[in-house]
UniProtKB/Swiss-Prot annotation:
Subcellular location: Membrane
Any Pfam family the entry gives: Ank_2
Main location: membrane
Name of the gene: Ankrd46
Originating organism: Mus musculus (Mouse)
Coiled-coil ranges per UniProt: none
Key words, A-Z: ANK repeat, Membrane, Repeat, Transmembrane, Transmembrane helix
Protein's name in the database: Ankyrin repeat domain-containing protein 46
Repeat region (ANK), residues: 11-40, 44-74, 77-103, 107-138
SMART domains linked: ANK
Gene Ontology terms: cellular component: membrane
Transmembrane intervals: 195-215
Source taxonomy: Eukaryota, Metazoa, Chordata, Craniata, Vertebrata
InterPro entries referenced in this protein's UniProt entry, alphabetically: Ankyrin_rpt, Ankyrin_rpt-contain_sf
Length: 228
């Protein structure tokens, strides 16, 4: 069951709009090729895309879109062509060309709400519900991703500000990082136990040099004994 305004007449004095109402693809194409505006409106603000979509004429919808019809156009009540749809293929075409499934008209009604009011078939309702669910999930993923991006940017900005306020700290961190890398490479090349042995030899040499220079053995109490 497609959606048509109850008080509407099926007649109009605009040839292109009448062709869309009648589902006359050939005449619609001829008019568009002759220069008719694909976005021309009727007295309610509806374009040919609204009228063709309401009647499930997906071929004419595709034709209008090819000639530049605006899929986002709304009538004077804020309805897009999707608000008037009652056919699966027409809905799929409009959504694939940029129409949001959760868009509201001036009364706050979405295409799904209007479809339920009109009593369209269950396949259409299920499709609209599925598309709305996908839209919500996509929005949640997008919001989560944006939040993570903002948090990362704030963290990087804070680190950059800290580095600018403490330039010596940044330089010191660079030197420390370079030393750490060099030390790790040295240990890997020489081997842990050889490095340990080298450190022990250096320590013993240091003790020997200290004794040679001062004549005092380190760690030995050389205070003279008191004679009673």
């Amino acid at each position: 069951m497609s959606y048509v305004f109850v008080n509407d007449s099926s007649q109009t004095n605009v040839p292109l709009l009448q062709a869309c109402i009648d589902g006359d693809f050939t005449y619609s194409k001829r008019l568009l090729e002759s220069g008719f505006d694909p976005n021309i409106r009727d007295s309610r603000g509806r374009t040919g895309l609204h009228l063709a979509a309401a009647r499930g004429n997906v071929d004419i919808c595709q034709l209008l879109h090819k000639f530049g019809a605006d899929p986002l156009a709304t009538d004077y009540q804020g309805n897009t062509a999707l608000h008037l749809c009652g056919h699966v293929d027409t809905i799929q075409f409009l959504v694939s060309n940029g129409l949001k499934i959760d868009i509201c008209n001036h009364q706050g009604a979405t295409p799904l709400v209007l479809a339920k009011r009109r009593g369209v078939n269950k396949d259409v309702i299920r499709l609209l519900e599925s598309l709305e669910e996908q839209e919500v999930k996509g929005f949640n993923r997008g919001a989560h991703s944006k939040l993570e991006t903002m948090q990362t940017a704030e963290s990087e900005s804070a680190m950059e500000s800290h580095s600018l306020l403490n330039p010596n700290l940044q330089q010191g961190e660079g030197v420390l990082s370079s030393f750490r890398t060099t030390w790790q490479e040295f240990v890997e090349d020489l081997g842990f136990w050889r490095v340990l042995l080298l450190i022990l030899v250096i320590a013993l040499l240091s003790l020997g040099i200290a004794y040679y220079v001062s004549g005092v053995l380190p760690f030995v109490d050389n205070q003279p004994e008191l004679v009673h």
